[in-house]
Amino acid sequence: MAQAKISAKAHEGRFCRSSSMADRSSRLLESLDQLELRVEALRDAATAVEQEKEILLEMIHSIQNSQDMRQISDGEREELNLTANRLMGRTLTVEVSVETIRNPQQEESLKHATRIIDEVVSKFLDDLGNAKSHLMSLYSACSSEVPPGPVDQKFQSIVIGCALEDQKKIKRRLETLLRNIDNSDKAIKLLEHAKGAGSKSLQNTDGKFN
């Protein structure tokens, strides 16, 4: 009888300890789940800051190279450029880095995709029109929507092999490059139009004097 009571108490003790350990384990797991959500929120916030920095730099650069900037006095342009350079300098002081965890295959895919884009960018000065068409096909390869033009199937398979965060960064880089090309095209057309108007004005003036 005494032995039975001792055994029962020992069994009860083991049960209590086991139940207590399970509760602790459950609480710890719940805490880690909550921390994981906060970690992902932190990464998302840092990525958003990183993107905002890129957008700000692009906007400042766009203003400095805008047609409006060419059509003001030298003194005003110098003053505005000083302000733009100051803003750019302050923007560059913000350092944000979100490292992406990659396996060797994803690392290689990212290098391959980056190399392809860099090769297209290097041809901007030689043939901007062809480079833009090539960039459009690369961008279409990254789009989940029905592309308006041809898709670079080889590039698409390479991008699919990249980490998800890298896929988003590749798409953003292509968007930025295409916007810069469009802005350059507009600036060139406006400049040519201004030159053409100036040339006609001079011809009319010459005609009057003749």
Swiss-Prot record:
Phosphoserine sites (modified residues): S20, S31, S73
Gene3D superfamilies per the UniProt record, alphabetical: 1.20.58.890
Transmembrane segments: none
Record-level Gene Ontology MF annotations: adenyl-nucleotide exchange factor activity; heat shock protein binding; identical protein binding; protein-folding chaperone binding; tau protein binding; transmembrane transporter binding; ubiquitin protein ligase binding
InterPro entries: BAG2 (IPR037689), BAG_domain (IPR003103)
Signal peptide stretch: none
Keyword Phosphoprotein applies: yes
Subunit structure: Binds to the ATPase domain of HSP/HSC70 chaperones. May interact with NWD1. Interacts with HSPA1A (via NBD), HSPA1B (via NBD) and HSPA8. May interact with DNJC9; the interaction seems to be histone-dependent.
Listed name of the protein: BAG family molecular chaperone regulator 2
Gene: Bag2
